[in-house]
Curated annotation (Swiss-Prot):
Provides the (R)-glutamate required for cell wall biosynthesis. GO terms for molecular function: glutamate racemase activity. The gene is murI. The keyword Isomerase applies. Substrate binds at residues 7-8, 39-40, 71-72, 183-184. The active site is at 70 (proton donor/acceptor), 182 (proton donor/acceptor). Pathway: Cell wall biogenesis; peptidoglycan biosynthesis. This is Glutamate racemase. It comes from Campylobacter concisus (strain 13826). Disulfide bonds: none annotated. One of its GO terms (biological process) is regulation of cell shape. InterPro entries: Asp/Glu/hydantoin_racemase, Asp/Glu_race, Asp/Glu_racemase_AS_1, Glu_race. The lineage of its organism: Bacteria, Pseudomonadati, Campylobacterota, Epsilonproteobacteria, Campylobacterales.
Length: 262
């Protein structure tokens, strides 16, 4: 089966990496909207247009299902995409429910880091209210992380200083989970792990998203790991340049290392 994965940029490679670990016999189309990244500070109308352009492109190129591997696009566009397109559309959702289910100490909180659009959006707030977790959840927008990720600036002093400056706003000893509410943030798990107290676990929504994809399409987890069959597109143009393909390969290799950090 041909499956499309769409993100504003290269953050969604973390979702592709998760998909390849479980569904290696399937074909994937990965669409990175690099001309318009980042989405986190764009208007709602802009994000809707970009999302429809991307998903329609993937469907036109044979995708039988599409994963919107972008929390910001999911927050803004998922309802409209599902209402107007006939293929299954799987969205991202910050792993707040997972953190809520795993937490065994009512005195400790969950910190969700995401883009400004996701943090201020109704979808995340509705999720928190439905879980009755408003008093146990704090939100923090980290817009610069997306730009760092797109530049492949993962471990610089600029990144570490930025994270420390933002996270110092919270008494981290009062938290037990940090939820990555943006797929770009998976690149920074090592830097986050250095800053966070040992008792704070890092979780993301990638595994849950691919589980939903498998369930909705009735797929089976691959019994063997085959060579990935993936075509990459930058805002509708197939990526053929060797240097760009090598960059994507390096990013996937880094994300595979980051999967082990929690």
């Amino acid at each position: 089966m041909r499956i499309g994965i769409f993100d504003s940029g290269l953050g969604g490679l973390s979702v592709l990496n998760e998909a390849l670990s479980k569904l290696s016999e399937h074909e994937f189309l990965y669409y990175a909207d690099v001309k318009n990244v980042p989405y986190g500070q764009k208007s709602r109308d802009e994000i809707l247009k970009f999302s429809f352009d991307a998903v329609k492109f993937l469907v036109k190129n044979g995708a039988k299902a599409v994963v919107v591997a972008c929390n910001t696009a999911t927050s803004v566009a998922i309802k409209e995409l599902r209402a107007n397109l006939s293929v299954p559309i799987i969205g991202m959702e910050p792993a707040v429910k997972k953190a809520h289910d795993l937490s065994h100490d009512d005195a400790l909180k969950t910190l969700v880091i995401a883009t400004p659009v996701t943090v201020n959006g109704a979808k995340l707030k509705e999720l928190i209210i439905n879980l009755n977790a408003k008093d146990k959840t704090e939100l923090l927008a980290l817009p610069r992380l997306v730009n760092f990720a797109e530049k492949a600036e993962f471990e610089s002093e600029n990144v570490k200083s930025y994270l420390k400056e933002e996270l110092v706003k919270f008494d981290l000893s009062k938290f037990d989970f940090l939820v990555l509410g943006c797929t770009h943030f998976n690149y920074f798990k090592d830097s986050l792990r250095e800053i966070l107290p040992p008792n704070v676990s890092i979780i993301d929504g990638n595994e849950g998203t691919i589980k939903r994809l498998i369930s909705e399409l009735g797929l089976k987890i691959s019994s063997v790991n085959l060579t990935p069959n993936v075509k990459f597109f930058y805002s509708g143009e197939e990526v053929c340049e060797q240097n760009e393909l090598e960059k994507i390969s390096r990013n996937l290799a880094r994300l595979e290392k980051m999967r082990a950090i929690c």
